[in-house]
Structures are given as C-alpha cells and as structure tokens.
Amino acid sequence: MLTLYNARSIITMNESLPRASAVLVRDGMIIEVGEPERMEPWLRHEEYVVDDRFAEQVICPGFIDPHLHPSMAAVLLPMEFITAMRWKLPWGEVQPVTDSDGFDERMAALSDMKGVGEPLFIWGYHQLWHGPMSRARIETVTGDKPTVVWHRSFHEVYMNAAAMDMIGVVAAEIKPGMQIDIERGWFFEGGLGYAISRLNPWILAPEQYAAGLQRLKQVVHSGGHTTIGDLATGMFNLTAEAEALSQHLEGDDVSFRTRLVAHGTVLTKGGVPPQQGPELAEALLQRNSHRLHFGRHIKLFSDGAFFSQLAQLQAPGYIDGHHGEWLSTPEVLEQHIRSYWYAGYQIHVHV
C-alpha cells in the first residue's frame, strides 16, 4: 500500500530538486518525492491513500547523528557543566569558563549548593583551559565532599579521596598498567572502566539515568534529529543500558530512531575468547524493535581520546613529548577485528 503525503512545501536538501509538494511512501520507505502528477505511474499500478495531515505545513528532512552515545549523554546531561564552550540546552544556557581560577570558583559555588554528603558530578573539564587537575586540587576547593570531575572527552575522570571512598576504590587493587594514577585521583582510558564499574550505582541509578534519557530526548528533538547512532552500546553496563533504552527510547513520544552498535570488547570481557564475540553480538538482534535496532555492526577501540591528548600519534608527536595510550594494543585489536570480519560484520574502530 502506497501513501501519498501532500505538503505546502517540502525542502529536499537536494540541489537537483530543492522543493517539492508531495512524497510517496511504501512501508516506511520513500519511493518518490516531487509533484503529485509526476507520481501517476506508481499510483496507476498500486493501491494508495492520500494523507493531507501536512497539507498546510512545510516538511524538511531530519538530521542524522551517527555517533552520539545516548547512554553517555544520559549520564553526563544531569551533571553540572563547567566547560570552555557555551552550551545552549533546551532547559537553559551554560556560560563558558575559560581559565583555572574560573573553574575553581564555579566548582566551589556548585559544591556549596549541594547538601552534606551529596556527591558533586562535574563534566567539561579540559586542561588546555582549566589547567592540571588532581585529587589535591579538588580537595582544596570542595574538601571532603565527594567530587567527581569528568574530562570533556569523557575518557578520563578525576576524584577526590571522599569520592574514591564513596565508590569503594581499593588502592591495593591498583596495579601498574591499569591506567590509573591513584595519587592524582586520575582514571583514564582503560582505568576509566575500573572507575565506571564502581560509579554505576550513582550514574546509572534508575531515577538519575531515566532523567538523563529524558534530557537526551529533548536535545535530540530540539536539534531536528530523526536518527541517532549509539557507537558503543554497553560501555557502562550492557544489560542495564539495553533495558533502559527499551523503556525510554521506544514509544510514541520518541521522535527518533536509534541504531545500536555494541561495544565489542565488553561482549567478551572476563576471559571470553574474541572468537565468541560474533555469536554474542548476534543474540542482541533479538532485542530489536521499531525505534531501537542492532545490526551486524561492532565497535572496537584502538587508542585514547584526542581531546585528552591520549591518542597515539606518529612523528612528530606531541610538542611536550608525552605519548598516547592504548585501549587495545594492535595485536589484541587485530584478534577482535578478524573475528568480526570473518563473521561478516561492519567494523567501527575508535582511533
């Protein structure tokens, strides 16, 4: 069955036909865009209905954000923002903070607004504007109030001693190579996973996470996006994320679709051989619904975040001489890639 949608005007964003007045659809797929009379060859051969709900309105294409991370957004959007850039959000505007003194002043003000023992989560820190961060610096500002400062890249986080005690960081568990500097309260790249596993009771608390997903829906809708991509489903907790996304991003009040791409190394953590990854990824297809869809895609990670200056660079490298960090060494990454490649998966790699 065809449906012919009439509109006052359709902005196609196609130079060959910038404007039209009708769009013909079959089973959710656009068959043709143009003027109704041009669609007669289709209409003569198939049953169709005319839908005039947009007859007095202008239709324009929705945008696609292929790399959004809705779970990450749901975690950070409820946080307090201290960033070097202005953020215009549906619920308010955040003014930029571009120096270290301003960052500390804002952090102190936010700390004063929190109740005794109530943790403070801050997102948006970046060393190029806000200077070096450390446990000692945070404690100078917020004292023994549990405080978590998340880097702009999201690939690293800093905590004071109170926050580390709150989430149960055990110094004796920290081994060389874990990408954790316990003295600085710094958890980066692979070490971020250690921190997240202990932060999950706070950042994935049902009410908190649901509020974050509601904010995500507002942001996506206000930006005119009709499709987004989650390029690392499971980065926090695969089961919890999948269930929450199904609850909050599937329904008539959701104005967009989400393509889900699983975090490949999460599927095979705990000693599961990479060769079993495709089988585990295939099982996720059973979760597909109208707005949430896993495909034969997988996300893998190579090196650190560019925003954090932890990406691996070839010569001449970083000006100060430091080196980036591996999330997966080339040898390990190759094992995962080959497993999914031979299983026919499209592979997305963070580099």
Give the residues covered by each predicted segment.
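A conserved non-catalytic segment of reverse transcriptases
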Residues: 302
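Flexible, glycine/threonine-enriched loop-and-boundary segments that flank and lead into catalytic domains
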Residues: 278-283
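Divalent metal-binding segments
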Residues: 2-6, 11, 15-26, 30-276, ...
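Accessory "access/gating" subregions that flank catalytic or transport cores
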Residues: 286-289
